[in-house]
């Protein structure tokens, strides 16, 4: 608000109001001041771990909660753990979402698949303004760092190399 900046926050709607999470009052105030809110499902459980009915419930009920609390349509979903299948995409579209986001770091272009969009994620914990600015202005470079770090970090013999690549 102070800097007149906007962004999108993805809510795990069953977590709203829990200690360490936003309250619906905070969400509403932020929404009224230009922040956008999307769904990150009810429970944050990967959608591909549910049967179709469970998937549908997570998608529809989370979307309804955001829309009811904010009085605005909810068009965005961030897939928990970035995981999705053809069935997840079908249920996402059926639930009325227009855009789906992964956990991959990167910028979005007009030609991108609207249900497989990269983002510039910020997870829990403090983030300095300098780090925030770096992530936004250098998101393409940041994406390369993130992907390189993840690639090298998952193999035992390259873990030492991963430690030399800064996590964006």
Place the predicted regions along the sequence by residue.
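Substrate-binding clefts and substrate-entry loops adjacent to catalytic sites
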Residues: 38-53
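Short, catalytically relevant binding-site loops at active-site mouths
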Residues: 14-17, 43-45, 83-84
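A cross-domain feature marking catalytic cores of carbohydrate-active enzymes
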Residues: 9-13, 39-41, 79-81, 119-121
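Active-site beta->alpha N-cap acidic-glycine motif
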Residues: 1-33
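C-terminal active-site subregion of NodB/CE4 polysaccharide deacetylases
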Residues: 1, 49-168
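Catalytic domains that recognize anionic headgroups
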Residues: 6-9, 42, 71-74
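A structural motif
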Residues: 27-41, 58
């Amino acid at each position: 608000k102070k800097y007149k900046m906007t962004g999108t926050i993805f809510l795990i709607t069953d977590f709203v109001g829990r200690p360490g999470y936003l309250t619906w009052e905070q969400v509403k105030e932020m929404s009224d001041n230009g922040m956008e809110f999307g769904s990150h499902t009810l429970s944050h459980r990967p959608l591909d771990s549910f049967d179709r009915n469970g998937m549908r419930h997570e998608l529809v009920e989370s979307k309804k909660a955001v829309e009811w609390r904010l009085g605005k349509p909810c068009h965005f979903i961030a897939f928990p753990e970035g995981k999705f299948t053809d069935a997840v995409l079908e249920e996402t579209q059926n639930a009325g979402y227009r855009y789906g986001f992964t956990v991959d770091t990167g910028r979005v272009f007009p030609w991108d698949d609207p249900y497989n969009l990269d983002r510039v994620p910020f997870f829990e914990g403090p983030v300095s303004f300098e780090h925030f600015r770096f992530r936004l202005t250098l998101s393409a470079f940041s994406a390369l760092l993130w992907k390189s770090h993840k690639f090298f970090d998952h193999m035992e013999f390259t873990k030492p190399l991963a430690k030399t690549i800064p996590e964006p």
